[in-house]
Amino acid sequence: MKELNFSSLKKLEIILDGEHRGFATDLLDRAGVKGYTIINNLSGKGSHGFHEGHVMFNEDDVLIMIIAAVPPALVEPILEGFAPFYSKHSGVVFISDIQVTRLVKFAD
């Protein structure tokens, strides 16, 4: 069996209103993020109370989470891009240390 090689990256979990998906994905694309996963229709409780996930009329009316694995050097520029946004809108970015086995998926 071939030995697995692990590489350290940072995982960003970005939670925001679905109507701002374009802003967030554009920021990630411009920062050089190679890919991300978008999860729609979140439920949860935060500083604005409980948010029930449901798609009644369109996907802009729900909370979404965008998950991205990025090199540590990209974290600060991405957070700087979100800072003005989060001063006016609700949401949060969680940052975690992770290990990945296929670094080629995240590199240039």
Which stretches of residues belong to each language-model region?
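Positively charged, small/polar-rich N-terminal and surface patches that mediate targeting and assembly
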Residues: M1-D108
